[in-house]
Amino acid sequence: MTSSIECKNFLRSLQLLNLLIKIGVKNLILCPGSRSAPLAIAAGELNKLGLVNIFNSIDERSAGFHSLGISAASGHLSLVITTSGTAVSNLLPAAVEADRSCKGIIFLTADRPLRLKDCGANQTVNQEDFLSSVCRKVLSTNLNGIHETEENEIFNLVRISEKQMSTFPGPIHLNVPIDKPLDISFLNKKNVLEVFERIYLKKKYVFQEVDIKSDKKKFLEISKNLNLDESGIILVGPYQGSINDLPSFNKSLGQLQEITGWPVFADPVSGVYSDLRGLIVNWELVLRKNKNLINCYQLLRLGPMSSSNDLEKFLINFQGVQILIKEKNHRKLDPIKKSFEYDFGLTNFTSLLKKELSINEKNKKSLTPLALDLLEEGKQVKEILKGNITYENQITEYRLANLVPKLWPAENPIMLSASSPIRDWLTFSENGTLTRNCFSFRGASGIDGTLSLALGISRIKNPLLLVTGDLAFLHDINGWLIENSIDMNLTILLINNNGGNIFNRIYKKNLKEDEFKKLFLMPKEINWPKLAEGYQVNFRSVANFKKLREAFDWSISIEKSAIIKVDIDPQNEICEKNSLLEKIIGS
C-alpha cells in the first residue's frame, strides 16, 4: 500500500470511526463539506459493512439536535461529522443542550492543518475554541493532519472519550485537522480497505473499564440527616440518566418508597413507572391548593427541579432537610441552594441505605398519613378536572394536556417541546406520561431544535407524538431537510396560537396590543397546508377532540411524518384556565 497522504487520511479516518463504533456509536449524522471528505468516505465504507447507520443533514444546527435526539432515545453515544469553519459554530446550540441534559454525543469536525492557521487562509478559523465552554472534553488528532496521527494516538483519543461518557456523559468535541489531498483514487481506496479489513477491522481493542466508585463517606454524611421515622416526600424531576438505566432507577425508587412509605411527586419526564405505590396524581395542583398545609420533616429530590413555580416556592419556604440525588451529573443542580447533593445516583444511594439499615426485600412500610392525605387530595382534584374537561369541550392547551395522553395510545412515546407544553402537562396531564417514554429537553429549556430532536427520537422510538407550539416548530423548520425525515413515524400535534402563547401569561397586561405583538408574541401568518406541502409532509387540521382522535389513528396508520394542527384562542384559553384553577383552589 502506498504511504501517500491520501491513503493515510483514509486509513486513519477508518480507524477512528471504527473505534468510535466499538465504544457504542450506532448512528452517524453527516453534514456536507470538502475538508471532511476522508471522514465521509470512510463512514460510507463502514456503512456498507453494516457497522453504522448514516443520515445526512445539510444544516449542521439541525444535525446536532437530530443526533442528540437519537442519543436520548437509544441511550447510546451518537456522532456528527462536519466540515470546517462556520459549520462548527452551528453545533453550539445542540452542544449546550447536550451539556445540560447530560447526553453523550461526539462532534467530529474536520479542520485545516496547523500550517494554515493564523495566516488568513480561506475558511480557517479558531474552531477548536467554539464549543469549549460546554464540552466535557476538546480533543484533537495531530495538528499537522490526521495522516501524521499514530494508531495508538487515535486509540487514546477514543479511550478518553469512552471514559468520559461512562462517568459524566455529555458532548465531546474531537477536532480533526486534515491536509490535502482530500479525495482518494479508486485503486488506493481498494488497497487501503483491503489492509483495514485484514488487519484492523476485527482487531480486539481493550478499553479500560471505568469503576464508578461511590463515596460512602459522602453518603454517610448526607444520610445522617434522614429520619425515616418522620414524614417526607420524594420529588422526582426530569430524568437525566441513560434511558437504558430506567429499569434499575425505577426498581430503586420502588425500594426507596417501600422503605419510607412516603408520597411521590413525579415530573412528566421523570421516567417514573405509572404503577409506583404512593404516586400522587395532580400533585402540582394539590401543592398549589395546600401550599401552607403540607408539613413534613424532609424531602428527597431526584434530579433537577421541575418547571413549576408552585414547587419552587414550596422548596424555598421549606424548613426541613432536603437531599438531592443526581444521575451521573457532577455539577451543582440546586438553584435554591438548600439541599445536600449526592452525585452517584439513586441506585447507589438506595443500595447503601439498605445496607446501612440492614433492610431486606420483605421490609415494607405502610403509606404515611401524609401520603394518604395527598392521595385523597389528588383524587378530589381529579374529580374536578373530570367534570370540567370533556371531549365535547373546545380545544385549549390545558385540555390537550389532560386529554391527549388518553387519546394517544398508552404505550406510544411522546415528546413535549419547551415553553408552554411542558408546563401545561405538568399541571394537567394527571401522570398520563408515565405509562410510556416521555421526552422533553429541559437541560437549557430552549425551543431550539424541537423538530430535529423529535425526528431523532422517532428513529429509535416510534410512533412518536411531538406536542409543540407554532413558534417552537417554525424555529427548527430546517429539520425537514434531514435525510428521509418525511418517512419517520412521527405525528406532530401543532398547537397554533399564532405566536408565543407563554408570553400572554406574563407580559400582555402591561403592554399595548401592538407593542405586545411586536416585542413578544411575534405572530406569523403561515399558510400551514402550503408549508406542509412544500416539504411533502402529510397534513390535517382538526377543530374538536373527536376529530383529533380520528387524526391520531390516521397518522399512526400511514407510518410517515404527519402534522395535525389545532387552532387555539389564547385569550379564551387564559380566562377558562384561570376559572378552573380558582375552582380547584377554592374546593
UniProtKB/Swiss-Prot annotation:
GO terms for biological process: menaquinone biosynthetic process; phylloquinone biosynthetic process. Its cofactor is Mg(2+); Mn(2+); thiamine diphosphate. It is an enzyme of class 2 (transferase). It catalyses: isochorismate + 2-oxoglutarate + H(+) = 5-enolpyruvoyl-6-hydroxy-2-succinyl-cyclohex-3-ene-1-carboxylate + CO2. InterPro entries: MenaQ_synth_MenD, THDP-binding, Thiamin_PyroP_enz_TPP-bd_dom, TPP_enzyme_TPP-bd. Belongs to the TPP enzyme family. MenD subfamily. NCBIfam families: menD (TIGR00173). This is 2-succinyl-5-enolpyruvyl-6-hydroxy-3-cyclohexene-1-carboxylate synthase. The lineage of its organism: Bacteria, Bacillati, Cyanobacteriota, Cyanophyceae, Synechococcales. The gene is menD.
